[in-house]
Amino acid sequence: MKNLAFWKSVFLTKSIITCAEGAALFFADSWIRNLLNAQPLFNVEYSQLFFGLVFFIGVAYWWVANDISNNHGIIKFGICAQSFVFAILAYHTAIGTIHPLYLIPGIIDLIFAILYSVFLFLYSYKQAEPALE
């Protein structure tokens, strides 16, 4: 498949974004909520678990960037997870339970879910082509 360097940079970029987002929210969620005049969460431990998982999903994207041909299960998981994050954030933004700025990470996730889908489509298409002799 051509452009593997481009796709590696896509997965590496998302890895950095996701790890940074998970770490930042893990340590600064209450500060961010105060800044946005948003209500604090009742169960901080659940959000900390989620933010920790977000960080480790970023690590998984790093694994993908370093071995694109063998980590398609992680890519499929990423498509599902990122689409779900967007759907939840869009819903809660629409009904007014979260500040609209919280939708920005959801939009970023949706963009990467689309990019991941394009990658899988192109990769499977290129693998299905018969070898020319």
List each model region and its residues.
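Membrane-interface helix termini and inter-helical loops of multi-pass transporters
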Residues: 30-41
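Juxtamembrane helix-break-helix junctions at the cytosolic face
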Residues: 32, 60-73, 93-94
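Cytosolic juxtamembrane helix and N-cap/initiation of the first transmembrane helix
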Residues: 1-17
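Membrane-water interface at the C-terminal end of transmembrane alpha helices
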Residues: 111-133
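Hydrophobic alpha-helical segments of small multi-pass membrane proteins
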Residues: 75-89, 105-116
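Membrane-helix boundary connector in multi-pass membrane proteins
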Residues: 69, 87-104, 121
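Membrane-interface helix-boundary motifs at transmembrane edges
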Residues: 2-6, 66-72, 98
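Core segments of alpha-helical transmembrane spans in multipass integral membrane proteins
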Residues: 16-26, 42-66, 77-87
